[in-house]
Amino acid sequence: MAGFKLKVTPEMESLTQVCVENSKMDPSLYGKYDVKRGLRDVNGKGVLAGLTQISSICSTDVVDGKTVPCEGRLYYRGYDIHELTQGFLREQRFGFEEVTYLLLFGKLPNEKELADFKVLLAGQRSLPKNFVRDVIMKAPTKDMMNTLSRSVLTLYAYDHNADDTSLPNVLRQCLNLISVFPMLSVYSYQAYNHYIKGKSLYIHNPDPKLSVAENILLMLRPDMQYTQLEATILDLALVLHMEHGGGNNSTFTTHVVTSSGTDTYSAVAAALGSLKGPKHGGANIKVVQMFKDMKKQVKDWTDEEEVGAYLRALLHKEAFDKKGLIYGMGHAVYSISDPRAEIFKGFVQKLAHEKGKDKDFALYSMVEQLAPKIIGEERHIYKGVSANVDFYSGFVYSMLDLPTELFTPMFAIARIVGWSAHRMEELINMDKIIRPAYKTVKKEEIYRPLEER
């Protein structure tokens, strides 16, 4: 591309250094001015930025007047996630559509409401004429999140009421995006797989009679075949990733951008940009890569001493990516347990058995047991560290033959539901733009004419 510089030149390096020298701040200033930088305070509470009825997270109880860690709890619209998932699993139903209804409308649907809602979503599950050919197939990229963002922003051009932020219109847009996100994600991967990796191209139309999870597997696989267990566990994964409070980075982004009065497509694209970040949406990829390295370095996967030595090497920055982290362990809110991981684990074991991956599952289980103790000893952390949902989700996606390029888009397919609910909530309750304050710590300077500098 003429005029578009693709290389970092020495000039760019030099200018970057000037930027760093004049932008770096003394870390002690954050403590001086009691600035939390959007993080947890000394009492473990987040910086309170708003109110929500959509979901809540509980990781502590008050016992004898003292706040103590407890088993993690997650509620969708006031319903415990354990009870929600057990409800549809016990009745051998897929839960994506039911929980989507709950998060958007604040109540559980009855049989007729759920049946009608499924028909509504299925009816929205189509893209504009030639969209796949003209938008997705042209200029495919190696990053599916960027392709997904581009597709969402392009859909703006096909919507004659794109800028209308009335509640019925925003709901229409959100339901349409929820319905087409699986298509956008899978088709983007198929384009990448064909045009960049040179593999065969498969474009399968979704089946309106099937659930979201079933359609993802149908569209992704050349033979369109899948087992009931595969579809069930993918559906469960999507439900567990749908929502996690208004304070997570991408959902807060949705609130902030929505408060400006912008259109739905721009708000969702902004949330996608947030989720793409490896500190938010890419953790499960790191877990899979870490275990791949572990399997190469550890000769006996059943030897706790050898596995423990590898985990200590991770913390000492001597193994894998040398970042000093055991990926999939620990969470910003949960300490004793992540309820999503607890729900997930039993089904992971069933899928591992079906796929002949019992030894792999045993290794994951061993790491889950050893890591908290080792982290506590090495880092002197005694508040509690446990496996989070990312610890098992990457393993599940790998067993489902989902390519790593689709790991974060799977997160987006689920979280678009939560983003939509929060966008509606912001529009219903707020009419002010979110504008947090920043403390200026730069001293005033005297202006000098150009010839005197």
Which residue ranges define each predicted feature?
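Non-transmembrane, aqueous-exposed alpha-helical and coiled segments at domain scale
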Residues: A2-R453
